[in-house]
Amino acid sequence: AVEYTRKQNGEKRMKHYNGLVQLEVNRLADQYEVEYVKRQVEQLPQTFAAFCGSSGRSVKIWVRFARTDGSLPTATQEVLLFHAHAYRLAVTCYQPMLPFGITLKEPDLMQSCRMTVDEQPYYNPSSAPFCIEQPLTLPDEETFRQRKQNSESAPERMTPGCESMQIFAQMY
C-alpha cells in the first residue's frame, strides 16, 4: 500500500500511498473454491484485483479506498489511521459475501504477498474506491490480536467458553 524511499542516511521516508487494502481468504480446499471466491468478490465494483495465492489454496483481494473528495492521505499518521479504518470496512463489506472466513490481520502498510500462480487473475483498473472520511483516531472496537489474547490460558483461547478441566478431559 506504501512506496518508500531512503534518505542518504538510510532512513525510510514514505513516498506514496495507493489506497489499496489487501484481504486474504486462506485454507481453501481446491481450485473450485478459489474460483468461487474470485467470482464472488468480482461483484463489488471496489475490487481492484483478486487472484490465487502462491499456495494455490488462497485468494488475495485488493480493494480500493479514497477520501470522500477522491484524494488519499499523504502524512504518515493520516495514512496509518486511514488504512486501519479502510481495512476494517473492507472486512465488514466482503465477509458476508463469502462462505469462507477472511483471515484477520493487523492492518499493515507493508503487507505483501508472493507472486501469483493464477493464470486468470481478476483485474479491474477502473474499480470505484470505497469513500471514507479521514479518521482522526484508530477504530474503537478490539483488534483481532486483542480478542485472541484476552484469555490468559492457551486451552481457553483454543476452545472459548469451555473450562480448562473440560478441555483437558477431552484431550486426554
Predicted feature residues:
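Conserved short secondary-structure elements within globular domains
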Residues: 86-101
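C-terminal accessory/binding modules appended to enzymatic or scaffolding proteins
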Residues: 150-172
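Short, hydrophobic/amphipathic alpha-helical patches that form generic packing surfaces
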Residues: 1-4, 92, 117, 170-171
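Catalytic "initiation/cleavage/transfer" segments centered on a nucleophilic residue
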Residues: 75, 97-150
